[in-house]
Amino acid sequence: MDKEIHQFGKGHVLHQMLRILELEVIQIMPKVMTNKKKPTLHIGV
């Protein structure tokens, strides 16, 4: 029982981190695009 709860907690933290990372990428992407002056769409999405 404890193990299951622990794994769920880990998964939740990971999910939160991924969401934060996604938001940061969305904010950073336009800056990267304008800096490079050419589309870089070959990022593993």
Curated annotation (Swiss-Prot):
GO terms for cellular component: membrane. This is Putative purine permease 9. GO terms for biological process: purine nucleobase transport. It comes from the Eukaryota. One of its GO terms (molecular function) is purine nucleobase transmembrane transporter activity. Not detected in seedlings, leaves, embryos or root and shoot meristems.
